[in-house]
């Protein structure tokens, strides 16, 4: 059994950027890199699942998800890990864990973006009379890059920054 094959970096990268619909393919590739003999080992699967579980919980905690919410979401993980007896069951459990983490990430990012856009709109309303007010000024205020802010602002409000600023100035 080769424990060095567990790659926590690729898991963390997927947790940060992966999409829910790509989880199955990611887990398939991830478990393939671990090797069939490792996936057929009960001891290896238990080790891997605990390692992944801890990685997922650390990830959502770093995202700012409340500890009570993490504990509630993953409360039965010890029993679930103990019940895994095959490589296929391990892969299914990994998929469940990652999907839950991605949903928590997306919910958290949605709330974060929503509050940033609210802050940006308040800043615009307070400073709209300044002729030099620009998208980059507002993006700096909320701590986002100009391009990311522009995209997020349009998605959240349905208006571009310029359209919103113009409507505020006209009111």
Where do the PLM segments sit?
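Cytosolic nucleotide-utilizing catalytic cores of signal-transduction proteins
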Residues: 1-171
């Amino acid at each position: 059994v080769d424990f060095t094959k567990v790659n926590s970096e690729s898991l963390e990268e997927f947790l940060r950027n992966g999409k829910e619909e790509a989880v199955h393919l990611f887990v398939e590739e991830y478990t393939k890199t671990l090797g069939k003999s490792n996936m057929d080992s009960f001891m290896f699967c238990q080790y891997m699942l605990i390692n992944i579980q801890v990685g997922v919980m650390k990830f959502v905690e770093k995202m700012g998800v409340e500890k009570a919410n993490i504990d509630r979401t993953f409360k039965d993980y010890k029993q679930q890990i103990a019940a895994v007896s095959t490589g296929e069951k391990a892969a299914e459990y990994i998929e469940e864990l990652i999907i839950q983490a991605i949903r928590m990430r997306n919910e958290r990012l949605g709330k974060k973006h929503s509050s940033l856009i609210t802050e940006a709109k308040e800043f615009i309303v307070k400073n709209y009379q300044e002729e030099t007010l620009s998208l980059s000024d507002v993006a700096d205020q909320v701590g986002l890059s100009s391009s990311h802010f522009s995209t997020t602002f349009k998605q959240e409000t349905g208006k571009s920054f310029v359209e919103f600023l113009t409507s505020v100035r006209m009111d």
